[in-house]
């Protein structure tokens, strides 16, 4: 694992929009994970469900993103070994969580963190690195190889790495262009946005997750509608909504996230310490 000692910086308000957008989407999706599309309707923050958690509890998507954020905040540069160490603290000690324990940990992430060996096979094409990569898009400077190295801590397959790069490119387009970015993204990704919902896959494959999140963003007009659409796609509900929530959070801003959902979100002190 390498270390990039180039100093990086970020706008804290923008990072907050990104992380809270991600965390709220994650928490909305947690109760419905693995549920089949059309068998439920998410309209707000609820508890219990798949993982028997309190309403507002976020999962591995947010925890791993916070590991990245906290490392950058402390060091002001990208240290892959330090980030990997924080992943281990999350998995083994329950750091960066709401309740002091990790849950809903993906098989690939667990194995890579425990053994220190990232997945390079097709099994490494899951969305376990994509779900946490959004904070990197808020950094200046940031290069594709930085994003790929952070992905490769657990997911070293090129498809997984370049899916992370693509998400960061989308987020940086929004960050740098502002409101007109949606038109630009429609021009680039209209072939995804124009698909009927039946053709949108929301499983754990990294490319499918990115496409589903982008589909939700491009076919809605508010943060609320974007993340609810993502959850209601079913299957990997928390990760799809986390990625869609990060995109919508950066585009619409922190103020567009319903205050009730912010109030219901658990672990806000943990989040704020990391950003």
Language-model regions: role of each:
Residues 1-275:
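Structured, active/binding-site neighborhoods that engage oxygen-rich ligands
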């Amino acid at each position: 694992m390498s270390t990039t000692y180039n100093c990086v910086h970020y706008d804290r308000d923008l990072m907050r929009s990104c992380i809270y957008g991600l965390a709220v989407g994650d928490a909305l999706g947690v109760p419905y994970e693995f549920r089949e599309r059309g068998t439920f309707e998410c309209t707000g923050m609820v508890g219990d469900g798949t993982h028997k958690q309190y309403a507002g509890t976020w999962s591995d998507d947010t925890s791993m993103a916070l590991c990245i954020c906290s490392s950058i905040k402390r060091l002001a540069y990208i240290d892959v070994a330090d980030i990997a160490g924080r992943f281990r603290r999350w998995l083994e000690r329950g750091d960066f969580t709401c309740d002091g324990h990790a849950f809903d940990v993906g098989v690939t992430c667990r194995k890579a963190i425990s053994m220190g060996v990232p997945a390079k096979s097709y099994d490494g094409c899951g969305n376990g690195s994509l779900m946490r990569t959004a904070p990197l898009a808020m950094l200046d400077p940031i290069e594709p190889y930085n994003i790929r190295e952070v992905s490769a801590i657990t997911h070293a397959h090129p498809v997984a790495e370049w899916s992370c790069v693509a998400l960061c490119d989308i987020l940086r387009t929004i960050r740098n262009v502002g409101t007109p970015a949606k038109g630009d993204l429609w021009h680039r990704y209209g072939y995804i946005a124009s698909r009927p919902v039946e053709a949108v896959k929301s499983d754990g494959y990294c490319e499918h997750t990115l496409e589903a999140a982008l589909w939700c963003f491009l076919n809605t007009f508010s943060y609320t509608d974007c993340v609810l659409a993502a959850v209601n796609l079913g299957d990997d509900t928390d990760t799809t909504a986390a990625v869609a929530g990060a995109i919508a959070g950066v585009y619409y801003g922190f103020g567009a996230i319903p205050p009730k959902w912010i109030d219901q979100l658990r672990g806000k002190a943990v989040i704020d310490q990391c950003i």
